[in-house]
């Protein structure tokens, strides 16, 4: 299980990304449409002044229950270990054991 502060840090990053998402997209769009080099540099500076954690690249997918970052399944938001246990217990609707 990941440390609780690691999970909280990730949640804080997610909030920051959502907060600055529109501003970041607007600046990137303006950079592509800017005609002069001076404008582009000015817009790049504004983009760099935004917090680092407002970039979506810094997010890491983590299990909602354990905080584990590896073996993460997007469809459920769970790590492979928790997914397996919950599927065996029948806690995930629509998930059935495979047989062929």
From Swiss-Prot:
Belongs to the universal ribosomal protein uS14 family. It comes from the Eukaryota. Part of the 30S ribosomal subunit. It is found in: Plastid, Chloroplast. It holds the Pfam family Ribosomal_S14. The lineage of its organism: Eukaryota, Viridiplantae, Chlorophyta, core chlorophytes, Chlorophyceae. Its main location: plastid. HAMAP family: Ribosomal_uS14_1 (MF_00537). It comes from Stigeoclonium helveticum. Transmembrane segments: none annotated. InterPro entries: Ribosomal_uS14, Ribosomal_uS14_bac/plastid, Ribosomal_uS14_CS. Keywords: Chloroplast, Plastid, Ribonucleoprotein, Ribosomal protein, RNA-binding, rRNA-binding. GO terms for biological process: translation. Binds 16S rRNA, required for the assembly of 30S particles. This is Small ribosomal subunit protein uS14c. GO terms for cellular component: chloroplast; small ribosomal subunit. PANTHER family: 30S RIBOSOMAL PROTEIN S14, SMALL RIBOSOMAL SUBUNIT PROTEIN US14M. GO terms for molecular function: rRNA binding; structural constituent of ribosome.
């Amino acid at each position: 299980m990941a440390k609780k502060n690691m999970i909280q840090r990730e949640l804080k990053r997610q909030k920051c990304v959502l907060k600055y998402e529109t501003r970041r997209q607007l600046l990137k769009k303006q950079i592509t449409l800017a005609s002069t080099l001076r404008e582009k540099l000015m817009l790049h500076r504004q983009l760099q002044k935004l917090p680092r954690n407002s970039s979506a690249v810094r997010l890491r997918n983590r299990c909602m229950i354990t905080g584990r970052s590896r073996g993460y399944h997007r469809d459920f938001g769970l790590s492979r270990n928790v997914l397996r246990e919950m599927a065996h217990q029948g806690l995930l609707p629509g998930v059935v054991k495979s047989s062929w």
